UniProtKB/Swiss-Prot annotation:
May play a role in DNA repair. It seems to be involved in an RecBC-independent recombinational process of DNA repair. It may act with RecF and RecO. This is Recombination protein RecR. GO terms for molecular function: DNA binding; zinc ion binding. Residues 79-174 form the Toprim domain. Pfam families: RecR_C, RecR_HhH, RecR_ZnF, Toprim_4. InterPro entries: DNA_Rcmb_RecR (IPR000093), Hlx-hairpin-Hlx_DNA-bd_motif (IPR003583), Rcmb_RecR (IPR023627), Rcmb_RecR_Znf (IPR015967), TOPRIM_dom (IPR006171), TOPRIM_RecR (IPR034137). One of its GO terms (biological process) is recombinational repair. It comes from Geobacter sulfurreducens (strain ATCC 51573 / DSM 12127 / PCA). Gene3D superfamilies: 3.30.60.80, 3.40.1360.10, 6.10.250.240, RecR Domain 1. Keywords: DNA damage, DNA recombination, DNA repair, Metal-binding, Zinc, Zinc-finger. The gene is recR. SUPFAM superfamilies: Recombination protein RecR.
Amino acid sequence: MVHFSDSLSRLLAELQKLPGVGEKTALRLAFHLLKSPDNAAALADSLRDVMSRVRFCSVCFGITEDDPCRFCSDARDDGAICVVEEPQDLLAVERTRAFRGRYHVLQGALSPLNGVTPDRLRVAELMKRLEGGGVREVVIATNFTVEGEATALYLARMIKPLGVRVTRLAHGIPLGSDLEFVDAATVQRALEGRSEL
């Protein structure tokens, strides 16, 4: 086993806390930073800057430097709210330019086995926004995972009694895919969600 200095060991440990970074990748990144002190200093400055300036929007809980964020302060359709799990999901929907309403970031998805219950998410804040009136439709854009589906069903059950239309993103076969290579569950969902031509 190789022993590193305390400072290098600490850097390796911190890098491994990042998603998708294992021991080998952490080591490669650490040595790259050691060989490029200017890049390392710029990275450290950038991290300090983003940690001091970026925060969660008090309305939608996306990330922002200004509160409320531009998605909450721009002229948009106040009658539609797209609910996503994470801030990066908000950006993925926004990149399509297909949705012109408001957003709400849950900060996760229901996962009782991992201790993530509705009170650990931004569900209460969503319900408060809806109870304020004026919202016609909530588009649930949670991930198509067990947790995302459970979250979507839970939210639909909570929202429908308010008289607000609840819709879910369509899912199915990706563009450019050959049907023979798509799994059966995806084909089944695509068949169930088929639309008129």
